[in-house]
Amino acid sequence: MVADAGRAQGALPVKTKLANALKSKGGDLKLVAYIMAGHPSAKRSIDVGKRLAASGIAAIEIGIPHSDPLADGPVIQRAGQAALQHGMTVAGALEVAAGVAKEGVPVVLMTYINPVLAYDPRKFAAEASQAGVAGVIVPDLPIEEAEPVSGWLRSASLDTVFMVAPTTQPDRIATICSHSSGFVYCVTVTGITGVRKDLPAGMTEMFAEVKKHTSLPVAAGFGISRQEHMKALRGHVDAAVVGSAIVDEIDRAGDGVALVRELLKACR
């Protein structure tokens, strides 16, 4: 039986702004673009975020830099380190999010739990909501330890997005789906983020298992960077998250828009 996330204890209804934006219609694949707040500067990340928001993406994920980013590959790690060296903070990242959110595309924050705890979770939730953020991903926050942080996010009308990995067992997938709102994030590989030539075999079985347990949109991330990847994902998930490839473009003084437009051609 499909687990309606709106029925999970204290969870948000399924039809949030984020869920509506990412739900596939007619088999099309939605695209979520990732940038790092403060990379290479606060102003530049806002400018890039606005350009990406106007490029046809369904949502934008903004990373909050952290000194110990366990899930980040080398490209995103470098971006985070540079942002920290330039003085980016949680408060600064919320300002970046506010600047990008004005464009109308849903903004999702990706943050590790320690910066949130250091900032004050209740304050973080309130200010993220005021900034126009739609949801938050905390990859190192287990469901069993999610309260009271997830409760404060819910009270601020923010989706809490949890992740499913290739190694996640079916009963655990059901639990994750019942606690997620906005969408469920499927990690395509075991390990860290980063551009890859090929996506792993067997990932479609994971997507199918997740869909048994939720009516939320299902997004795939980690290693997605090519049109071939988008074609392989289309019809199996609702959305694809592209991160390292865009951050690499920004490293080269670009904005990732040309890459996004090329990828979007393979989404329909």
Stretches found by the model and what they are:
Residues 2, 13-34, 97:
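N-terminal amphipathic alpha-helix/helix-capping segment at the start of soluble metabolic enzymes
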Residues 3, 7, 206-216, 225-268:
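Alpha/beta catalytic cores of nucleotide-metabolism and tRNA/nucleoside-modifying enzymes
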Residues 13-21, 68-76, 88-95, 117-122, ...:
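Active-site-adjacent beta->alpha loops and helix N-cap segments on the catalytic face
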Residues 31-35, 60-62, 107-111, 136-138, ...:
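Hydrophobic faces of well-ordered beta-strands that scaffold small-molecule active sites
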Residues 35-41, 110-118, 142-143, 164-168, ...:
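Glycine-rich beta-to-alpha transition loops that act as phosphate-gripper elements at the mouths
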Residues 45-50, 168-177, 224-240:
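Catalytic cores of alpha/beta
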Residues 62-67, 135-137, 142-145, 186-194, ...:
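Glycine-rich phosphate-binding active-site loops on the catalytic face of alpha/beta enzymes
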Residues 75-108, 152-161, 165, 202-218, ...:
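Alpha-helix-loop-beta-strand connector modules within alpha/beta enzyme cores
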